[in-house]
Curated annotation (Swiss-Prot):
A lipid is attached at C23 (S-diacylglycerol cysteine). Its main location: membrane. Residues 1-22 form the signal peptide. A lipid is attached at C23 (N-palmitoyl cysteine). Belongs to the staphylococcal tandem lipoprotein family. Keywords: Cell membrane, Lipoprotein, Membrane, Palmitate, Signal. Transmembrane segments: none annotated. It is a lipid-anchor. It is found in: Cell membrane. GO terms for cellular component: plasma membrane. PROSITE patterns: PROKAR_LIPOPROTEIN. This is Uncharacterized lipoprotein SA0398. The lineage of its organism: Bacteria, Bacillati, Bacillota, Bacilli, Bacillales.
Length: 261
């Protein structure tokens, strides 16, 4: 074989090798970019944390699409719930949901106390109690009289995670467990945190968390990654998760149409 032919063959082989390698890198880049897309999608609301004064949301507009009727300024939906299930005991949830209507500049919701028992010999039993609340001058107060002084105090002292959480370091979270289903669409990114993480310390400060295990942070959402008023975005700090014991905290801040609020 002549020199020119051997050289041409060498060039062809090298081009093929680079092409194969390039495809691998392209796939890695796409996976990495998907993680970045998820973080950027969540950052649209998480960058607002901490929201010291929730009434500031009356003047804050979120993502709008065709689901909003003309003239509707939208409603912010906030929730924070702590769920605990010690070994051998029932699952208990305590938290709050608040709906801030930007049209009426009023905020109402409810404090929830929920107990769920799952006996293999019986049907799952769910006992839920809701206490209606409203927000006045950035303070949560019960709408109806409450005889239980402990619950009343818990409501009046309640703070949403969005009021003290801070995600300025979100962009620095790396190597998350990424899941994405474009057909649903459903997406998530999970990160192992450390106990010295700011948000973890804030949760331990406010809640009696029995385990010393550092939690995993899960960012999970539905709908178009680029934005959708139909989809949902939730964050979850999971300290313990197994069949015998569960300890996790969930938080959400959504902007939606005011049709149902």
């Amino acid at each position: 074989m002549g020199y020119s032919k051997r050289f041409a063959l060498y060039i062809s082989v090298m081009i093929l090798i680079f092409a194969i390698a390039g495809c691998g890198k392209s796939d890695e880049t796409k996976e990495g970019s998907k993680e970045e897309q998820i973080k950027k999608s969540f950052a649209k609301t998480l960058d607002m944390y901490p929201i010291k004064n929730l009434e500031d949301l009356y003047d804050k507009e979120g993502y709008r699409d065709g689901e909003f009727k003309k003239g509707d300024k939208g409603t912010w939906v906030i929730s924070s719930v702590m769920v605990k299930q010690p070994k051998g005991e029932i699952m208990k949830s305590r938290g709050m949901y608040l709906f801030l209507n930007r049209n009426t500049r009023t905020a109402k919701g409810y404090f929830i106390v929920d107990e769920t028992s799952n006996d293999t010999l019986k049907k799952t039993e769910d006992k839920e109690k809701r206490y209606p609340v409203k927000m006045v001058n950035n303070k949560i107060v019960p709408i109806d009289p409450i005889n239980d002084k402990g619950v009343k105090k818990e409501i009046e002292n309640f703070k949403f995670f969005s009021q003290y959480g801070d995600f300025k370091e979100l962009k620095n979270y790396k190597n998350g467990e990424v899941s994405y289903n474009s057909e649903a669409p459903i997406y998530s990114a999970k990160y192992q945190l450390k106990n010295n993480d700011y948000n973890v310390k804030q949760l331990r400060k406010r809640y009696d968390i029995s385990t010393e295990k550092a939690p995993k942070l899960l960012l999970k959402g539905t709908g178009d990654l680029k934005g959708s008023s139909i989809g949902h975005k939730d964050i979850e700090f999971t300290f313990v998760e197994n069949q015998e014991e569960n300890i996790f905290f969930t938080d959400s801040l959504e902007f939606t149409s005011s049709e149902n609020y």
